[in-house]
Regions:
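An N-terminal assembly and electron-transfer interface module characteristic of large anaerobic redox
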Residues: 1-305
Length: 305
């Protein structure tokens, strides 16, 4: 029996947005996926050792996950995302990470490009990848479409679940952060656990209808450059009257977040806001003290009506 092609999936960046698409597609065309383990200090150290000092923490973590997969699979999936149109760019790390990985590692790299300006669409990239492993183009197309449907269905289920949370009378906090930051247990697990231990409902900025979030972001500013920043910031204005507080979580040294979050914080009125920047040496004790003070302020506001 022919051995299945093993595709390595680094547990970082777009993993938190597109994993269901990747899983459905590659397993459907006869491949098997190998996930890197959850982020830990060893992975961060491995990524940091092969990164330039100016790299942001998520990029270092991503390289650490690639290092963890190196020599353990036939291909490593590293998408290259440039833009979703002239007014919807993405951070340069999504554009450059493929070239960085390709230069640092000897493994075979599998990728698809998204660059709407140059006519490079996701569909074409998946077809190109798929026929490498399965010559039946109809099967390749079928599992790409199935992957998109399942990925969107899962995303909409999260949006609907979050909408139901809004109906509760419990204290609610919105966390504004990129998925690869807030859902990384090693980076933000202690923050999430703290709010849950305090019996606070948590809402997430990526679990909002993206079109609605973008429309709110464009009302805030028509010059926002990055698509993912639009989605984050738009959600903060969409939810500002529905939550008791907003937590901005970003990683060091993210240039886009440092600018956009600061602009949003200045515009958000009548709601407590805290801005937290995480790096690989963030002290838990100091962070918890800040969160405790933030929650105390929110509770005092609720008690005073």
């Amino acid at each position: 029996m022919k051995r299945k092609i093993r595709i390595g999936i680094p547990r970082g960046l777009l993993y938190y947005r597109d994993y269901i698409l990747w899983k459905t597609f590659f397993e459907g065309i006869g491949c098997t996926l190998i996930l890197s383990p959850p982020t830990n200090k060893g992975i961060i150290d491995k990524g940091g050792n092969i990164s330039i000092d100016e790299s942001c923490l998520p990029a270092k973590i991503y390289l650490g996950h690639v290092k963890e997969l190196s020599q353990k699979c036939d291909y490593i999936l590293v998408p290259r995302i440039c833009n979703y149109g002239k007014d919807n760019r993405v951070c340069m790390k999504f554009n450059g990470i493929y070239d960085v990985v390709n230069n640092l590692f000897e493994d075979k790299i599998l990728n698809y490009d998204i660059d709407y300006i140059k006519g490079k669409f996701e569909l074409f990239g998946f077809i190109k990848m798929g026929i490498k492993f399965n010559k039946n183009i109809f099967k390749v197309l079928f599992y790409y479409i199935m992957g998109k449907i399942k990925n969107r269905k899962y995303y909409l289920s999260l949006v609907n679940k979050q909408d139901k949370i809004l109906r509760s009378n419990k204290m609610k906090i919105l966390i504004v952060a990129h998925p690869y930051v807030v859902y990384d247990e090693y980076l933000c697990g202690n923050i999430i656990r703290y709010f849950k231990d305090e019996d606070i409902d948590i809402l997430y900025s990526d679990r909002v209808n993206r079109k609605i979030a973008i429309s709110y972001a464009e009302d805030f500013s028509n010059t926002l450059y990055f698509l993912y920043s639009k989605e984050n910031i738009g959600s903060s204005f969409y939810y500002k009257d529905c939550v008791d507080g907003i937590v901005f979580l970003s990683s060091f040294p993210c240039a886009s977040d440092s600018l956009v979050n600061e602009l949003a914080i200045r515009k958000l009125k009548d709601v407590p806001v805290i801005n937290i920047i995480i790096d690989d040496s963030t002290a838990t004790s100091g962070l918890m003290t800040r969160l405790e003070s933030f929650v105390d302020i929110i509770k005092a506001r609720r008690d005073n009506g």
